[in-house]
Each structure stands twice: as structure tokens, then as C-alpha cells.
A protein has these predicted regions:
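N-terminal hydrophobic targeting/anchoring segments and the immediately downstream early-domain regions
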Residues: 1-36
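Alpha-helical scaffold segments that flank or form the walls of functional sites
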Residues: 43-64, 146, 226, 230
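Hydrophobic beta-strand scaffold residues
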Residues: 13-15, 66, 113, 207
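Divalent metal-dependent hydrolysis catalytic cores, especially in the metallo-beta-lactamase
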Residues: 65-73, 234-238
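Structural motif
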Residues: 16, 69-70, 116-117
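A charged helix-plus-loop insertion that forms the helical arch/lid used to bind
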Residues: 32-43, 87-89
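Second-shell residues forming the walls of enzyme active-site clefts
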Residues: 1-7, 23-25, 90-249
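Short, conserved phosphate-binding/catalytic loop or strand-edge motifs used
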Residues: 72-82
Length: 249
């Protein structure tokens, strides 16, 4: 269906899918290559290239041209319900190397990547489907871990970044000393998107939200306020809607 629509559309379609562990992210008969942690466990970062090759070639074959991958979070807390085996583990250097290799394969298949979930998941035990999660690292700790990863992947040519419903209080306070003492997700934080991602890291590509149907997005403020605020904060594109007419208004 995706391929048919892609081939017959007057305007080229942007078709995205979670191509994290194989073509199975979009094709019912696609290969399930392996979770990212399984890839990391081999000790060979070239396996991440092979994962990207299988995922993106099969995705492209059915009309997908945008991979919501790779996951570049760090498995700092094994109880985290979102990341865990979806990550390349707890070593930032390995996460970076695997991410670079996935991007290399995706480019060869003419598939865009969305590195996720900025500013970095894997620190706490919160499910963003239910609440806003927190990246609790100091600015210095973040720079040496998640910052190193995002900087490297941006330099490697990542075209888009998927922003999670994740607060990063240290940098939010650093960019705005008057920032309120409450959890505000990155999707609603110009401090993190315009300040940290755009200005400090120099990212000039597209910023897309994680699913805005998650409570982690709307628990900070009512959705009718959150939608325009996310745009003002720096989000270029929304993933999913709840009521299209209401969101558009």
C-alpha cells in the first residue's frame, strides 16, 4: 500500500516507520533482524550498519523513506520501560559508533533518519505514555554522554531529530534561570530545542515530536495550549494527533 501510494502520488510522500530492528517495522513480512542491544552485544559496531541496511532497504522497498531510528538513548537504568533493549547499551562511545553506522546504511538506501529521543532517555523509570520523564544529568554530565552522541550524529549527517517528552532541568535552568520548578518536556521547551539543540549543537535539520498522544506531552499543559506552544518552542512537525480539527484550530 505504501509503495503504491508513493508511486502514484502527484506529490512525493514522506512515509515514516520505526525501522529500529529490521524491515518488520513497516512490512508484515519484513526481516526482524534483532534489537539494538543484541547488535551491541556482538561487540562489532559494523553489525549496526548491517541492521541499518536490512531495515532501510526493506523499508524503502515498500515505500518508506524515513526511519524513526536509530534509538540513541543510553541504558543508564535497566528499569526504564521505554528504552532498555532498544538501545545500544550503556557506553556512549558504542552508542555513537553504532548510530553512525546505521546512518551510513540508511543514506545508501536514500532513507532519512530520525535520531531519538532528544534530549536523551534511559535515566529514570518513567513511561512517557503516562508521565513526562526526566534526564537528570548535570550539564557537564550531559555533554560527556548524550551531548557527545548527538553532536557526533549531527556531524555524521542525521537529517532529523525526534524529540521525546523528556525534561532536562539542568540545561533548562542554564538557558533560562527563571525556568519554573516543574517538569516541562523538551517538546515544549525552547531552552532545549532552540538553545541546546539548535544553538549549542548546531542542528539545522527537521525537529519532529514523539507521539503527541502520550500523556508525557499533555500533562504539562492542556493540549489546546500545548500544540501551539510546541510550535513556538521549535517543533517543526508533529507525530500523530488526537483530533485533527481541534489541533488545527
Amino acid at each position: 500500500t505504501h509503495r503504491y501510494l508513493q508511486e502514484h502520488s502527484k506529490i512525493p510522500l514522506l512515509v515514516g516507520a520505526n525501522l529500529e530492528d529490521g524491515g518488520c517495522g513497516i512490512a508484515t513480512d519484513g526481516t526482524q533482524y534483532g534489537k539494538q542491544m543484541q547488535i551491541a552485544a556482538t561487540g562489532d559496531t559494523e553489525d549496526a550498519y548491517r541492521l541499518g541496511k536490512v531495515s532501510c532497504s526493506e523499508g524503502a522497498a515498500v515505500g518508506c523513506n524515513w526511519a524513526f531510528a536509530p534509538v540513541v538513548d543510553i541504558d543508564r537504568n535497566w528499569r526504564n520501560p521505554i528504552t532498555n533493549v532498544r538501545t545500544y547499551g550503556d557506553d556512549p562511545d558504542r552508542v555513537l559508533a553504532c548510530g553512525v553506522n546505521y546512518i551510513k546504511a540508511a543514506k545508501e538506501e536514500n532513507v532519512l533518519v530520525a535520531i531519538k529521543h532528544f534530549p536523551g532517555d534511559g535515566c529514570d523509570e518513567v513511561d512517557q505514555h503516562i508521565l513526562t520523564s526526566v534526564n537528570s544529568l548535570s550539564c557537564e554530565e550531559w555533554d560527556a554522554t548524550y551531548g557527545k552522541i548527538y553532536s557526533g550524529l549531527i556531524q555524521a549527517g542525521a537529517q532529523t531529530v525526534m524529540v521525546g517528552h523528556i525534561a532536562q532541568p539542568a540545561y533548562q535552568k542554564a538557558y533560562n534561570p527563571d525556568f519554573p520548578d516543574k517538569l516541562v518536556p523538551a517538546t515544549l521547551s525552547p531552552e532545549l530545542l532552540k538553545g541546546l539543540l539548535r544553538k549549542k549543537l548546531g542542528f539545522n535539520g527537521l525537529i519532529v515530536t514523539d507521539s503527541t498522544c502520550m500523556v508525557g506531552f499533555s500533562c504539562a499543559m492542556e493540549r489546546e495550549k500545548a500544540v501551539p506552544y510546541a510550535i513556538e518552542a521549535g517543533c517543526d512537525m508533529f507525530l500523530f494527533n488526537k483530533d485533527l480539527d481541534e489541533d488545527y484550530r
